[in-house]
From Swiss-Prot:
Function: Required for the assembly and the contraction of the actomyosin ring at the bud neck during cytokinesis.
Quaternary organization: Interacts with myosin MYO1 and its light chain MLC1. Interacts with BNI1. Interacts with BNR1. Interacts with CLB2. Interacts with CLB4. Interacts with CDC28.
Residues with Phosphoserine modification: 48, 83, 91, 139, 165, 167, 169, 369, 433, 440, 1064, 1068, 1088, 1383, 1385
Protein's name in the database: Ras GTPase-activating-like protein IQG1
Modification after translation (UniProt): Hyperphosphorylated. Phosphorylation is cell cycle-dependent and peaks at the time of cytokinesis. Contains 21 consensus sites for cyclin-dependent kinases (CDKs). At least some of them are phosphorylated by the CLB2-CDC28 kinase complex. Mutation of 15 of the phosphorylation sites to Ala caused both premature assembly and delayed disassembly of the actomyosin ring, blocked interaction with the actin-nucleating proteins BNI1 and BNR1, and resulted in defects in cytokinesis.
Signal peptide (residue range): none
Name of the coding gene: IQG1
Biased composition (Basic and acidic residues): 380-392, 402-413
Domain Calponin-homology (CH) span(s) in chain numbering: 184-291
Source organism of the structure: Candida albicans (strain SC5314 / ATCC MYA-2876)
GO molecular function ontology, one term from the record: actin filament binding
Length: 1647
């Protein structure tokens, strides 16, 4: 069978129309299939394609194949069969190669020449690595139909046209049917998609983006928008640099994040080296589909093919870009949103597309991403990027131009109409799935109507199919053979590559192990990164403050202004030249208008003038004729001869002149000729060099420009120096004189002219100004109306920028100006809820104070009962009687564990009671100790007095029962003291480093002391002990970085091994590091040190990951580090967040972690068996400590020998940041962590105990009393009152000796509510009043632009201010009424309703509705002056302190609200617990009193029924003798039924005096003598005794007194030896009197 017949029949099966061609192309392609050898042109040179075309055309002419219609040679849409083959399949198939002659292949087979390139291509699809038999079974039948069998063909009507030699090449094709046009359409669609995603304008056009995309800037920005994390983008696009590969690698991270299949990926060289740029756009096209599939908020890709226009140059540029790179099959990447055909193929294709894309996006769908589009981050990034860009106006095409008035062109809005609402129809051709079967070939029968259709070809279809299969098999086997050879030759390289790939995958799995956990915090991480990037960009901003206004700067600016002026003048001149004809016409019209009136008059009188003109013309013509005649009369030949002679002489003279010049310069001419000949010879010899220099033309031009610039500058400087010599002496005076004369003359002339027409000038100026102003207003109005949306948007952007700048200034500035406060003042104008909460909290605090005082009163009464029992015991009344019948609580004595408790007298006990209150205040309120330490200079901290004070203060916080998991009360208050000391030290620091320096702080001593507790050291050893022991035990580890010491170690080793060493010990470090053995050892030590630091960081990072199995960092360390971070932020807001984090890191390493590295012996870690090993281990730990400290400070080393580790330190910055932020300072407030608060002591039933040595107690008391004026705020301070009572209480030396003998005491501290002092309350009230007044003033005088508060206060008051103030007050009053109507009732015990709901409205400003603005301002000034007199404010800084407090209220509004809410919760709980305690104490006190009374009653009235001799024994005392005085006294009482219930006794005064019960007495009128005076002691009620005086049997009137048992015990407690009765007439001895009462009326215990 003939080969030509088979080829002809194969060609006849091709389609003619574009639709069918597109369908075929789509059928043979896979959905979203990248550019490869099956559906896009491979990388052949143009010459080979042309040869293929010529072969097919020659074959067609040999077979007499003619088309039905004549074809034009240059037609693209109606091309030859070769063109059809090339355009429809876009790749030379096996058929084309088989028809090519062997002579044109230059000895290379078509397979080797064409397909070998495809083997090395990186575009091989992923299915190429699968089963090749399945691929062959799925190959299309019409795509690679090849055969060598000849078959007769049907005669065609017309021959097939071949392209002529004059046809345009694809690189010069500018039509819309060219691939370049589609390429530009796809790029434009991707550009619009990028703009919508990035939310920024891309200034480059589609043709410019072909080369601009190589820098990867837009790709990196896209990655930052989509990925959870953001990284800096290299934005320098002046030229392509190698650093742009970082942007491309950033985009690769985005592809890895979405698991982008290899089908759509590209390599770095494809983009950076422009090897295959179209594949990059195809990757973006596929990525848009995946993003839209996953998150519909991302827009879908549009299809702009046929809908946009491009210039011919742009299309040619795109075609040239596609010469060496194939055009991807973008149509397969369309989402199918356009109109679809009704055929079954299209429906199947659509389903196949969806199925394939589902597979593509399935890895992402498995784990739903929490990604959200961070709009705020995008805005911040755009602002940071745009800060460094020049201000350019962008037109619709994206090109930047300088916005300047153009006198020749009108302002025309070139922006194209918005296409946001237009429906873009995607004309996506239908496609078929890539599924073919050889047994049942798919034949498109629609070609039977074609002129190329041959029925005879159908009978040979099985043979054709078999031929195609054989051809494909042969090609495939050859390619597999070549692939196997190549793979065999690169076996070792591939092994290494696969190992690297596997390692990379393993590392990626390790890196992304916590990705899902981090995604939950993506928003916080993004905000943190945005803040960090903001600080980085702020730090990178250039500093223009150092630029001085020197002469060079002024000259440079002058040159720039001159250049701009010349360019503008040239621009105007060129514009005028363009319109020269119009200008000439316009000038002609102007001139015509000027002479029109004159010529019109002349024409009107032409009849009169015409005869005279005709006569004048006749005379003129006659004169001209006569002249011409006289000139013609001269002989021309003679004139010609004369002229020839003259010209000859002139030529000869010119030749002589030139020859003379040549002779005079002969030697120079010879040299010039020699130079020229040498140049020509060198040019011929160095053509290759010059050709290479052509590519360096830019560099040479720069060199020449530099040389010319240097020459010009030398010339300019020389002229300038010459002028400078005479500048002051001659030039400037002359110029000054001339300028003065000219200016004065011009001024006089101008003024004289103006004064002559002064009225007209004024009128003209007024009209002109009015016209200009109206025109400007009309122009602005029209512009705003036309661009209202843009104006609103611009205003919003400006407002946003201004607000951001103001907020930044408010946050970072230590002293924010008034204009910033004015902007944010409205934030405090609506604080109803906050103020109500503040009032509620204040009432709750007052209620807590009241309940605490009530509970203290109950506790005091119970303590008095305790004292009463002690006194009863002293008087031999058994306390066991009180304890037997009750199980109630017994109160412990004031001082415990004291042997000599009975030796403490009343004054000592009173002293101890005061100490209990005093040290409770000192322990629980850290501000007192902070002020005490602040009054002591830092230099005295290490002195003996300073150390004694420190040790005494430490004893106030005895942390004994604490542990890592359990926190005691003392630890809570100790940490609060550390935090307060740190805040005070930070306020006194000058830089960030001062916060962590021992000699400039007080808190470090307490922190270090607490860390030295046994349980703290044990925990740190458990945390790092194994790590340190491993370093110490490893004798091979050496971290030495000093070259001299390394050099000496080598010498010592040689001495030890060889017994001698030839090296000299006198050598410098620079010379030592040059030695190979020292250098190798140095590098090895640093590498080992780096690895050890990395291991330690890994341990801490695992701790940061939240692993509960690991040991945690103690809470107090976290709290102190967090406080250091917050203090650094408040004190130094202008520093970066990294520097703030470094403060916390230094605290953690230097003052906690470093202790086990510096002093391992304190942790029970032995550093070695001998001195050498100990020194080496300590040095290793010391170097490890230095590097860890430098790592956590995030600063490079200044030490020359440790500088090689700076790169490692910078690379570990992100890791250290994460450790600090997640593991160290990630902790709440101290109350939340310790679950304690200041009210806990008030609600507990047991008082807190404090065991302290008496010496420390006395020293602390002395220090506090000496500095009481410093540590307290005023006389109304509770601590001050307590100190005054302590000073008033005087004790004797004997008592002091007794106290010192006790060694130590355990005090039951007296919890007392801490009330605010009157001075502080008054100051706070005045500040609140001033702030409230100032807020009203700022709101009223909003239009005042003054930045000074003092100027605002003293500025004048306008009527508009009064009106504005009244409006504000009325508005607030209306809001107040609404708030009161809607307010809910609150419990009367917790809060009272307030009438005002404005901020600061609880102060005594009075009714604002009755105040005028003048009175308000006056009141504000008076309050400020009061604060100034108190020293709180100063006018030197314009009362900036007041503005700072308002700014603090604005900044901390939210935190204050949270703190207030927490305080409300704590206060409510405290009130509840205090109420429970109050009820408990009430019940206990009542039961205690009732029980004591019942016991005393029982003791006074023993059961008489149980005593058989009760008649003889009365009240359990001795038997009364019969016929005694007592006997008759009792009988008389019983006779008159007056016998008291608990007995009565009668004694004479003389007997009482003898018993020393009665000391002195005197009668009123000497009624009776002492022997006749009797005292009667009776008891009618329990604990009440009546004393009466009688003379004989007659009672003395008025001589009756009642005394209680409590009064007697009080006399004994107060050590009063005597007391008076009967209005001072009788004096008794207290002790003997009490002894008489207890003996007669109570049952005393037996000793």
């Amino acid at each position: 069978m003939a080969i030509g017949n088979i080829a002809a029949r194969y060609l006849s099966s091709l389609e003619e129309t574009d639709t069918t061609a597109t369908t075929t192309t789509t059928t043979t392609s896979n959905v979203l299939q990248p550019s490869n050898r099956l559906n896009s042109p491979t990388k052949f040179n143009r010459k080979s394609l042309d040869n293929n075309s010529q072969d097919l055309d020659a074959l067609a002419r040999a077979l007499n194949i003619t088309p039905s219609k004549p074809e034009t040679p240059t037609s693209i849409s109606k091309g030859s069969a070769t063109s059809l083959l090339r355009t429809k399949f876009e790749s030379p198939s096996a058929t084309v190669s088989s028809f090519k002659s062997t002579s044109s292949s230059n000895g290379v087979s078509p397979t080797k020449k064409n397909h070998f390139v495809e083997i090395t291509s990186d575009e091989t699809p992923s299915w190429a690595n699968k089963n090749y038999k399945d691929i062959l079974n799925k190959s299309p039948t019409k795509f690679n139909t090849q055969s060598n069998v000849h078959t007769p063909l049907k005669q065609l009507n017309q021959p097939i046209g071949t392209p002529s030699s004059s046809s345009l090449s694809p690189a010069k094709n500018a039509s819309k049917s060219s691939p370049g046009y589609e390429y530009l359409c796809r790029i434009e669609a991707i550009k619009q998609w990028l703009e919508s995603v990035l939310q920024e304008q891309i200034t480059q056009s589609a043709s410019q983006l072909i080369s601009y995309i190589r820098n990867g800037i837009h790709l990196a920005k896209l990655a930052n928008v989509v990925l959870p994390t953001s990284k800096p983008v290299f934005l320098n696009d002046s030229k392509l640099q190698f650093k742009h590969t970082e942007n491309i690698n950033r985009f690769f991270q985005l592809l890895d994040f979405f698991n982008m299949p290899d089908l759509f990926r590209f390599e770095l060289t494809d983009l950076y080296d422009a090897k295959n740029v179209p594949k990059v756009w195809f990757c973006l096209h596929a990525l848009s589909y995946i993003l839209h599939k996953q998150d519909p908020s991302y827009p879908a890709m549009n299809n702009l093919v046929g809908k946009v226009d491009f210039s011919a140059d742009d299309i040619r540029t795109a075609n040239r870009a596609l010469v060496n790179s194939p055009l991807p099959n973008f149509s397969s990447a369309d989402t199918g949103e356009g109109k679809s055909d009704t055929s079954n193929n299209n429906s199947s294709t659509t389903s196949a597309t969806a199925a394939f894309m589902d597979k593509v996006t399935s890895p992402v769908k498995k784990t739903p991403s929490p990604l959200k589009r961070p709009q705020q981050l995008q805005k911040k990034q755009l602002e940071l990027v745009e800060d460094n860009k020049p201000e350019l106006t962008q037109d619709s095409s994206g090109l930047s131009k300088i916005s300047r008035d153009d006198p020749f062109t009108d302002r025309v809005d070139l922006a194209p109409p918005s296409t946001s609402n237009a429906k873009l129809e995607l004309h996506t051709p239908p496609s078929k799935s890539l599924e073919f079967k050889i047994k049942s070939p798919i034949i498109d029968l629609s070609h039977r109507d074609s002129d190329y259709y041959t029925p005879e070809l159908e009978s040979h279809l099985p043979n054709i199919i078999k031929f195609q299969s054989l051809a494909r098999g042969a090609v495939f086997r050859y390619l597999m053979f070549v692939d196997r050879i190549l793979l065999k030759s690169y076996q070792d390289e591939f092994t290494n590559l696969f190992a690297i790939i596997r390692g990379n995958k393993a590392r990626r799995k390790t890196v992304h192990k916590h990705r899902d956990e981090l995604r939950l915090y993506s928003f916080e991480i993004i905000e943190l990164q945005s803040i960090i990037r903001k600080n980085f960009v702020i730090n990178k901003k250039p500093n223009f403050t150092s630029i001085t206004n020197d002469v060079e700067t002024v000259e440079l600016q002058s040159l720039i202004r001159g250049k701009l002026t010349r360019d503008w003048k040239k621009y105007v001149t060129n514009g005028l030249e363009k319109f020269t004809p119009q200008i000439i016409d316009f000038q002609s019209l102007v001139r015509m208008k000027s002479i029109y009136s004159k010529s019109n008059k002349v024409i009107s009188y032409k009849d009169e003038i015409l005869p005279s003109l005709i006569e004048l013309q006749s005379i003129a013509r006659s004169q001209l004729y006569h002249r011409f005649s006289r000139s013609n009369a001269i002989d021309e030949t003679e004139i010609i001869k004369i002229q020839s002679i003259i010209r000859r002489n002139a030529v000869i003279e010119d030749l002589y002149t030139k020859l003379s010049k040549v002779r005079s310069n002969k030697r120079r001419l010879i040299e010039l000729q020699s130079i020229a000949r040498g140049g020509v010879a060198r040019t011929k010899l160095c053509n290759s060099v010059l050709v290479t220099l052509i590519y360096e033309d830019g560099i040479l031009n720069q060199l020449f420009a530099k040389i010319r610039g240097d020459n010009y500058r030398k010339k300019f400087n020389s002229q300038k120096s010459e002028l400078l010599k005479y500048e002051k002496s001659s030039i400037i005076p002359v110029q000054t004189l001339f300028r003065g004369v000219l200016s004065r003359y011009t001024k006089e002339v101008t003024l004289s002219d103006i004064f002559d027409q002064i009225d007209s000038v004024i009128t003209l100026q007024s009209v002109a100004r009015g016209k200009l102003m109206r025109g400007s207003i009309y122009e602005f109005s029209d512009y705003y109306q036309k661009h209202i949306k843009q104006v609103v948007k611009a205003q919003a952007i400006l407002q946003r920028v201004f607000a951001q700048n103001a907020y930044k200034q408010l946050i970072t500035s230590k002293n924010p100006p008034l204009k910033v406060i004015r902007r944010f003042a409205p934030l405090l104008s609506n604080n109803d809820r906050d103020f109500q909460d503040e009032m509620t909290l204040s009432d709750l605090k007052d209620l807590i104070i009241e309940k605490c005082k009530a509970n203290e009163e109950y506790e005091n009464q119970i303590e008095q009962l305790d004292m009463k029992l002690g006194l009863l015991d002293k008087n031999k009344i058994s306390i066991e009687e009180f304890l037997k019948p009750t199980k109630g609580k017994t109160f412990k004595p004031i001082v415990e564990n004291v042997k000599n408790l009975e030796r403490l007298n009343k004054s000592l006990k009173k002293k101890i009671e005061l100490w209990q209150t005093l040290f409770y205040f000192i322990q629980t309120n850290p501000i007192y100790l902070t002020k005490l330490f602040n009054s002591i200079p830092y230099t005295k901290n290490q002195t003996k007095s300073g150390q004694d004070l420190f040790q005494s203060v430490i004893q106030l916080f005895p942390v004994r029962d604490s542990s890592i998991t359990y926190h005691s009360r003392e630890e809570y208050f100790l940490v609060k003291l550390m935090i307060q000391l740190m805040q005070n030290d930070t306020a006194n620091s000058n830089n960030l480093g001062d916060i962590t320096k021992l000699h400039l702080t007080n808190w470090i001593d307490f922190f270090t002391n607490f860390n030295n507790h046994t349980f703290q050291r044990q925990h740190l050893k458990a945390l790092l002990g194994k790590f340190v022991i491993r370093i110490v035990d490893n004798e091979q580890v050496d971290f030495e970085s000093d070259p001299i010491r390394i050099y000496n170690q080598i010498i010592d080793h040689e001495m030890k091994v060889y017994g001698r060493s030839e090296k000299s010990r006198d050598i410098s470090p620079q010379a030592a590091i040059q030695l190979p053995e020292v250098s190798n050892k140095f590098v090895g030590n640093l590498m080992s040190l780096r690895e050890t630091c990395s291991d330690l960081l890994s341990m801490l990072q695992k701790n940061a990951s939240g692993n509960k199995a690991l040991l945690q960092i103690p809470d107090h360390v976290k709290l102190i580090c967090r406080q250091g971070y917050l203090c650094a932020q408040r004190k130094f807001p202008d520093k970066s967040d990294q520097q703030h984090l470094a403060v916390a890191g230094v605290i953690f390493v230097k003052h906690y972690l470093g202790s086990i590295l510096q002093v391992p012996e304190n942790y029970g870690i032995l550093t070695g068996n001998n001195d050498t090993q100990k020194a080496k281990s300590k040095d290793n730990l010391r170097y490890l400590y230095r590097v860890m400290l430098q790592l956590f400070s995030m600063k490079p080393f200044n030490d020359n020998f440790l500088k090689p580790l700076n790169e490692y330190i910078m690379a570990s910055t992100d890791t250290v940041k994460s450790i600090i932020s997640q593991a160290i300072i990630n902790v709440g407030e101290i109350e939340t962590v310790y679950e304690l608060h200041d009210y806990d002591d008030l609600v507990t039933h047991q008082r807190p105990k404090l065991t302290i040595s008496v010496n420390s107690l006395i020293q602390l008391e002395k220090s506090i009393l000496q500095n009481v004026d410093i540590i307290t705020t005023g006389n109304d301070d509770q601590l001050y009152k307590t100190c005054v009572e302590v000073e008033k209480l005087l004790i004797s030396p004997q008592d002091m000796l007794t106290l010192t003998d006790l060694s130590s005491v355990t005090l039951n501290l007296n919890p007392t509510t801490q009330e605010e002092s009157i001075v502080d309350s008054k100051t706070k009230t005045l500040f609140t009043q001033a702030k409230r007044c100032l807020l009203y003033i700022i709101r009223v005088q909003e239009e005042d632009d003054s930045d000074d508060l003092l100027e605002l206060l003293i500025s004048g008051i306008k009527p508009s201010h009064e009106q504005r103030f009244k409006e504000i007050v009325q508005y607030e009053k209306a809001e107040q009424d609404i708030s009161l109507n809607n307010s809910k009732s609150v419990t009367a015990n917790t809060v009272n309703k307030k009438k005002s709901t404005r901020p600061y409205s609880g102060t005594s400003l009075g009714d604002l509705s009755n105040l005028t603005y003048h009175e308000l301002k006056k009141m504000c000034l008076e309050i400020i002056l009061k604060l100034e007199s108190m020293g709180e404010l100063t006018r030197k800084n314009s009362f900036q302190t007041l503005l700072n407090q308002i700014a603090m209220d604005i900044k901390t509004k939210d935190s204050q609200r949270q703190c207030r809410w927490q305080q409300l919760q704590v206060s409510q709980k405290t009130i509840k617990k205090l109420s429970e305690k109050e009820n408990y104490l009430k019940t206990q006190l009542h039961n205690y009193k009732k029980h004591v009374e019942s016991v005393l009653l029982e003791l006074q009235s023993k059961s008489k029924s149980n005593d058989k001799n009760w008649k003889r024994r009365l009240f359990n005392i001795m038997v009364i003798p019969v016929f005694s005085k007592q006997y008759f006294y009792h009988r008389e009482l019983r006779k008159h039924n007056r016998l008291p219930k608990f007995g009565s006794y009668k004694y004479s005064a003389k007997k009482l005096i003898d018993q020393k019960v009665l000391i002195d007495f005197s009668t009123a009128n000497n009624v009776a003598t002492a022997s006749k005076l009797d005292f009667m002691f009776s008891c009618h009620q329990v604990g009440k005794f009546t004393i009466e005086v009688a003379s004989g049997t007659v009672n003395i009137p008025g001589a009756t007194n009642t005394i209680t048992l409590d009064e007697l015990l009080a006399l004994q407690y107060e050590n009063k030896t005597k007391f008076e009765l009967f209005d001072g007439m009788a004096t008794f001895d207290s002790n003997n009197f009490m002894g008489l009462i207890f003996r007669k009326f109570y049952d005393l215990k037996k000793e």
